[in-house]
């Protein structure tokens, strides 16, 4: 679905890239936040017990939730990171700790 807002009730960020590409990039970015699991109120022990496929599944769910939530809430804390939607720049920024920053292009 190109060039529109996705989500049943108009939520989600405006984008021009394929949703799957954005979701893949956002999944990778949030996966770099070491305690991203805290977003789902998971304990470190539960996260440590997950195999890589399980962790990927959690990060994909997180990326999808963030994509829709950022349409109404442009700054969201995720563990020790922060995810920021900048509509004028057509990007989602992921701040990891105090210094590392990555971004996901939306167009």
Regions found by a protein language model. Give the residues of each.
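Alpha-helical propensity feature that highlights long, continuous alpha-helices across diverse contexts
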Residues: 2-107
């Amino acid at each position: 679905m190109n060039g529109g807002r996705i989500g049943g009730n108009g939520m989600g960020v405006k984008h021009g890239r394929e949703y799957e590409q954005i979701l893949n990039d956002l999944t990778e970015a949030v996966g770099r936040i070491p305690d991203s699991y805290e977003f789902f109120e998971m304990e470190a022990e539960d996260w440590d017990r997950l195999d890589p496929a399980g962790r990927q599944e959690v990060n994909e769910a997180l990326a999808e939730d963030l994509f829709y939530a950022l349409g109404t809430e442009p700054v969201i804390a995720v563990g020790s990171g922060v995810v920021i939607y900048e509509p004028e720049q057509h990007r989602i920024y992921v701040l990891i700790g105090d210094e590392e920053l990555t971004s996901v292009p939306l167009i």
